[in-house]
Amino acid sequence: METDTGALPKKQDFSEWYNEILWRAEIMDVRYPVKGLYVWFPYGFAIRKFVYQHLRELLDRDHKETLFPLLIPEQEFMKEAEHIKGFEDEVYWVTHGGTTPLEVKLALRPTSETAIYPMFALWVRSHADLPIKIYQIVNTFRYETKQTRPLIRLREITSFMESHTVHATWDEAEIQVESEIALTREFYRNLCIPIIISKRPDWDKFPGADYTIAVDAIMPNGKTLQIGTVHHLGNHFSRTFNIQYEDKNGEQKEAYQTCYGISERCIAALISLHGDDKGLILPPTVATFQVVIVPITIGKRHEDVLAAAGKLKNDLENAGLRVTLDTRDLRPGAKYYWWEIRGVPLRLELGPRDLDSGKAMAVTRTGEKTTICLANAAEDTTSILTGITDAIRAKAGEHTKSHLCTTHTMDGLDIALNEGKVAVVHWCRDRTCGDTIEEKANSSLLGTEVRSEYIEATDGPCIICGKPGKATLVGRTY
Ligand SMILES: Nc1ncnc2c1ncn2[C@@H]1O[C@H](COS(=O)(=O)NC(=O)[C@@H](N)CS)[C@@H](O)[C@H]1O
């Protein structure tokens, strides 16, 4: 599909850059005539496929994939008081089948606890049925009233991975929470996205959860994006939905649960953190094409060059790489531009001189220039791709580290936030001090028990009242 040409906005104008890159790199078409609903272009959908393929590989180590209905009957949805309170303003309802009014209104799942847990009540009888660990990757619907943005805040979340587990004890559920956190670390390491993990304050936890562990990334404009959440549900839902099991002594016991969610925000973070003024930069593990071969066929030996380029493509594909050979009738420079904006990590240029030297020019999207030996193409290319991954990961790490700081005063917090940074402060965990931090610094208190390789989270006197406080993450959020 032909998209516009011409310079991209600079990445420092992040909002404009982000919107333009979704169009120019053929990720999403935002022209769909319903607010908060967007269309995947095939190129963007291929990135989603590789990202979620990796997420499935990680989940399949310990969970089983399944699929539950989209529509939830009102009586089930309305069963869990806190859950309703959390979602009553966001849930879409289906009220008619054709022209016939439905006897029972049906909710479009905003998340699937109230679809799945009545079935768990049927599946769980004995301790031998536990643990249950399932997930699904589905679309969910939330009538978001804050500003909608493609991949970031949608009304139809098209790529909502939700995992739901059932355990015999609270402790086993907590072990599962830690296991999902480890899985999330591995997932985001593969995407070269640095994350900061923290425990959301009680007033910001998932409706019906005992506690929520959240995963945040720091976006180029310094705002944090919540790119994953793991919830310990205690026996809150099992009590409401009667998910009980007979233990070894024949007694009826309530089960304990977790749920865990990642949406296409992971792709928003991938695009935002790694891109530059020339466009996307995709980590090789999830790039639609890892290599683009551009034959330089100006002048003589046209056929030889094309033949050598074809052989190079085969060699690389036989080594399992995703390669495209661009033989379009365009100037090489136009091809370079086309694939740079689409974030292809490695370009191989092959001209007549290279045939004689048995080499090809290798230009990485992270700014390196080197050569590969055609006789050793697969090995040379694979090692360059590894180097590209390391460079992408290092750059994102530098960005995150430089946008994180510790401060002990409200003035310091204000300065940090106005500089587009995220701060670690000390908070006594008293709600009134929390509210003061949020109001005075126009910020969100993201959480305590901060875990990040980029910050030393120590304890100290509360930034408001001076009482003993805990390291607490504070930022401005999407
Ligand atoms: N409107 C939205 N658009 C895109 N992603 C969203 C939206 N709302 C939430 N998310 C993402 O989905 C994740 C899970 O959503 S959640 O409400 O926190 N948790 C749940 O729904 C739980 N049932 C776990 S699946 C969030 O961490 C956030 O990254």
From Swiss-Prot:
Q: Which Gene3D superfamilies match?
A: Anticodon-binding domain (3.40.50.800), Bira Bifunctional Protein, Domain 2 (3.30.930.10), C-terminal domain of ProRS (3.30.110.30)
Record's Gene Ontology CC terms? Answer: aminoacyl-tRNA synthetase multienzyme complex; cytoplasm
Q: Its catalytic activity?
A: tRNA(Pro) + L-proline + ATP = L-prolyl-tRNA(Pro) + AMP + diphosphate
The EC number(s) this enzyme carries = 6.1.1.15
* NCBIfam families from the UniProt entry: proS_fam_I (TIGR00408)
The similarity annotation says: Belongs to the class-II aminoacyl-tRNA synthetase family. ProS type 3 subfamily.
What is the designated name of this protein?
A: Proline--tRNA ligase
Q: What is the lineage of its organism?
A: Archaea, Methanobacteriati, Methanobacteriota, Stenosarchaea group, Methanomicrobia
